[in-house]
């Protein structure tokens, strides 16, 4: 497979590796971006395991809670400007209200909102506002107590990041603190048990390869892996993360002190995982001039 400059740039952007190292990683792994990242980490050439997904889409995430049921909905637009539009915000709020009774994203799009489906309401809004829009995704959660939080709010209940936290016991103030923590730190799962076993095994293998590069005895390597995986879990699982409100405690320990059990969470961020293709404007103009 031919390794292009764009592929090298993407790998450099996601790992902080040098140009020649990035090119070699792609060559060694036949252009497989994910395998190239692991190769760089194994060789100690990646500055950090940065997330390769680039956020590009605009819009708003809205959260709604009714009793022990909460929903979060992402509605995308082409520009950030539309997210500040009162008509767009009103539509997003209406969609979130409807989402409280929807089972999934398809049911939400087909649900009634003011005499028309949500999907048709969005199509009509496109004609009025003049930008392409879409109801991209929704997530829901149930629990004894459900608390919501919006980061970078554009209007009540909607902003760039929406979080829902479900707890048994504890008070609303603690739930709000946990929701703010989740917005800031973005844990991958509630606990180790909730992580994809394949992801855990892959991380363990990467750490094993890194440790073996040191040339240390196998018994020492095994102890190194235990320590490194413990550190990994403290970084990606909510209950094991250092609590932003009190860094001396893990979130799990803070929950015990608050008399609460955290049973789940939802975190949606606008544009998460969507990549937009950036056109080279100068090249486009040059091409047009040449005919």
Swiss-Prot record:
Q: Report keywords, A-Z.
A: Cytoplasm, Elongation factor, Protein biosynthesis
Which InterPro entries does the UniProt entry name for this protein? EF-Ts_dimer_sf (IPR036402), Transl_elong_EFTs/EF1B (IPR001816), Transl_elong_EFTs/EF1B_dimer (IPR014039), Transl_elong_Ts_CS (IPR018101), UBA-like_sf (IPR009060)
Region Involved in Mg(2+) ion dislocation from EF-Tu: which residues? 79-82
- Cellular component GO terms, alphabetically? cytoplasm
Q: Which cysteines are joined by disulfide bonds?
A: none
Q: Which domain of life is it from?
A: Bacteria
What molecular function does GO assign, one term? translation elongation factor activity
- Which Pfam families does the record match to this protein? EF_TS (PF00889)
Which PANTHER family does the entry mention? Answer: ELONGATION FACTOR TS, ELONGATION FACTOR TS, MITOCHONDRIAL
Sorted alphabetically, which NCBIfam families does this protein's record hold?
Answer: tsf
| Record's function text | Associates with the EF-Tu.GDP complex and induces the exchange of GDP to GTP. It remains bound to the aminoacyl-tRNA.EF-Tu.GTP complex up to the GTP hydrolysis stage on the ribosome.
Q: Which family does it belong to?
A: Belongs to the EF-Ts family.
The molecule here is called Elongation factor Ts
The gene name reads tsf
């Amino acid at each position: 497979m031919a390794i292009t400059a764009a592929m090298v740039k993407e790998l450099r952007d996601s790992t902080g590796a040098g140009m020649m190292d990035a090119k070699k990683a792609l060559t060694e792994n036949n252009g497989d971006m994910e395998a190239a990242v692991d190769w760089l980490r194994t060789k100690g050439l990646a500055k950090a395991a940065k997330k390769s997904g680039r956020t590009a889409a605009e819009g708003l995430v809205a959260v709604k809670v009714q009793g022990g049921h909460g929903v979060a909905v992402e509605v995308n637009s082409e520009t950030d400007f539309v997210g500040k539009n009162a008509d767009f915000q009103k539509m997003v709020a209406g969609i979130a209200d409807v989402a409280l009774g929807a089972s999934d994203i398809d049911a939400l799009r087909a649900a009634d909102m003011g005499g028309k489906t949500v999907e048709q309401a969005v199509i009509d809004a496109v004609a009025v506002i003049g930008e392409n829009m879409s109801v991209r995704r929704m997530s829901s959660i149930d629990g004894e107590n459900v608390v919501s939080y919006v980061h970078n709010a554009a209007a009540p209940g909607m902003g760039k990041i929406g979080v829902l936290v479900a707890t048994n016991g504890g008070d609303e103030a603690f739930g709000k603190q946990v929701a703010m923590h989740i917005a800031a730190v973005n844990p991958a799962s509630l606990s180790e048990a909730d992580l994809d076993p394949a992801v855990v095994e892959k991380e363990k293998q990467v750490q094993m390869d890194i440790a073996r590069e040191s040339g240390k005895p196998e018994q020492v390597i095994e102890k190194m892996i235990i320590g490194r995986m413990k550190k990994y879990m403290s970084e990606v699982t909510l209950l094991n993360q250092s609590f932003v409100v009190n860094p001396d405690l893990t979130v799990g320990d803070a929950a015990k002190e608050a008399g609460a059990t955290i049973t789940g969470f939802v975190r949606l961020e606008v544009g998460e995982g969507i990549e937009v293709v950036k056109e080279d404007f100068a090249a486009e103009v040059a091409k047009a001039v040449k005919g």
